[in-house]
Amino acid sequence: MKQVFQDARNAEITVEEVPAPKLLAGCVFVRTAASLVSAGTERASSEFAGKSLLQKARMRPDLVRDVLNKISRDGLMAAASAVRSRLDQPSALGYSSAGIVITVGEGITDINVGDRVACAGAGHAVHAEFACVPRLLVAKVPSESVSFDEAAFTTLGAVALHGVRNADAKLGDVVAVIGLGLLGQLTVQILKAAGCCVLGMDISSERADLALHLGADAVSTSASGFRDLCLQRSAGHGVDSVLIAAQSASNDPVNLAGAVARNRAVVVAVGTVAMDIPRRTFYEKELDFRVSRSYGPGRYDAAYEQKGIDYPIGYVRWTETRNMEAFLKLLADRKLDLQPLITHRFPITRARSAYDLITGKTPEPFLGVLVSYPQNASEDRHIRLSTDRRITAHQSVRIGLLGAGGFATRTLLPAMKRVRGIEMIVAGAATGAHARYAAQKFGFRSCTTDEKEVFSNPEVNTVVIATRHHLHAGQVISALRSGQHVFCEKPLCLNEAELKEIVAAHRDATSALLMVGFNRRFAPLAIRMKDFVHAAREPLAIHYRVNAGFIPADHWLHDPLQGGGRIVGEVCHFVDFLCFLTGSSPAEVETRSLPNPGWYSNDNVVCTLRFRDGSLGTISYLANGDGGFSKERIEVFGGGKIAVLDDFRRLELHGGGKNNIFRSRFTQDKGHRGEWEALVTAIQAGAESPINFDEIVNTMLATFALDESRCLGQPVRVRERELFNSDTPSATAGIDRAS
């Protein structure tokens, strides 16, 4: 399918051929008929992308702080690599579209194939021939009388409608609308449908005249004239509410809003404007200033938008979905007239012309700009980018990738590209945009949104799994059953039931190896550290401090069904590293948590592990620290020796009266390249996994036990991997509570 992208470096607009998106549970698959180009949001995005790095830094000091923190924590080269990766990845544009439902995902019961729908959401309702959209970002078009062109306005219409609701506009109110662009014109019509007296202001006489034509009671093109108009139409009191629908870096719209408002009026910022509130005016009038958030309650709530958990209507009357439905109902009842707002239509092949228009490269008046789509577009989920095999003497490990998110494209794939003997065959991701980006940047021959294309591809002998955690187990099993080697990013799975299935699949796949991305054990300084302490030949005491950093409670990693929580999803890394250093496996574990004040997610924990060789380890995994401080520090004591590894950049070795310091050259090295060099060597030699499969199972069993201990508040014994492999019917056979 064709999709519109923007280059983050220079704002160039391109139309690319990408695989159609994968249909996900709780989503609908839509053939797009029309989409709306937002003259506000998308123009601002294009203008920002077109600025120099220095200009971007001045506009987004928050991003500069993030980069500086990364430099102090990970080093200059790692930070530069992360910035380049972010800039290299093109942005998918668009957030308001309409079309016909082609397929519905699991769990969808109220949307049917063939339904005409409006779609919303950045990353979902994009400018593309097909879209996969979560259910609560979809609204049925209620009547055939509403065209696809009109329905494509629904997202922006919901933004305007939510602004009106925030203004508490009532029948008979006098309401001012500042800014009569597309958002302002929709706001004017919605207010008139609600029975308000509407006064509009825009410096463009053409837009002011259009607002009059669409129902505004009076308009003005100057600030002084608008102040007089508002006093005249409100019996000298000032207006009851003001909606700022302008896009401006100036504070003039907010100043004007304060000037025309009556005492205790409501001022709502719907557009993007400067908000340096004039205190004296707003204080003396006791004005209520509100910022209207997008298209209503539910926006930016992953539980609502991604999981489809609706808010009860008795508690939240107007969610974003219900705002979309209300706007469509106004269209069906002919309370709104959108035809005068549509000034341009472009086929998707000419999308660049649409952006030239809204960014001013084409000097021509515009308002509503639509993108149209052919109705015979291909739904192919697999795109071939090249046909030459480029076989080298070192070609052996032929990669099929599943998952092309931030970690894969910024860390994993760059490390793989530096290892000889790897050939990139097919890149798979849930969206065509991510799949194509990974394929083009890292030299894959083709890209797909259908994971079956990876498992069935005869050229792929090694599957790399870098998807979200809840998908790992099923994909690992599918690859093993296809006879393919597997590299799975951590965690291997989310629970013991999944682990038992993987153990069985691995037992049956006699010719395939399985490796998990426990990369830290392959870091050069980690190997030097182990060699040093291993000579002690006695149990070790290890303290591993992880300054993990805060992530919001609604982040997918905290979701037990999708991310598994931070203990399962991340602490497994550090459990493996302790197993690596001791050469043993945990026998008993205990997890204690700090009291949760409400904004953390049980991710401030201290884990204690007693190993079968007598070693003791503690992992302090903390989300309550300063993100600018170093992330990881490991201290090992044993046999009269001490080893300290600081953030995989500096290693201190103390023993026998000697003190030695080693540093990682140029940048932090956490072993990502090393793990792939070891894996390629193993595959080429027909050897077992660089991390023994029993060790992987033991690490996951210990991790599950740590999570269990956190819930129980008591120590938990971890059975040996051999016992777990027995044919016990229990799904939790690997864990024993300690008495």
Question: What positions do the PLM features span?
Answer:
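N-terminal Rossmann-like dinucleotide-binding module
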Residues: 379-442
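Beta-strand-loop-alpha-helix segment that lines the small-molecule cofactor/substrate pocket
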Residues: 262-263, 462, 473-518
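Contiguous beta-strand/loop segments that form the cofactor/metal-binding neighborhood of enzyme cores
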Residues: 353-356, 360-384, 569, 575-650, ...
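C-terminal capping/lid region of NAD(P)-dependent oxidoreductase domains
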Residues: 4, 236, 241-243, 268-271, ...
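Glycine-rich beta-strand-centered segment in the early N-terminal region that forms part
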Residues: 21-37, 45-123, 144, 684
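Mid-domain Rossmann-like dinucleotide-binding core that forms the NAD(H)/NADP(H) cofactor-binding site
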Residues: 123-124, 149-224
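Predominantly a Rossmann-like dinucleotide-binding segment in NAD(P)-dependent oxidoreductases
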Residues: 287, 298-315, 512-513, 519-598, ...
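Rossmann-fold NAD(P)-binding glycine/threonine-rich loop
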Residues: 270-288, 292, 298, 492-513
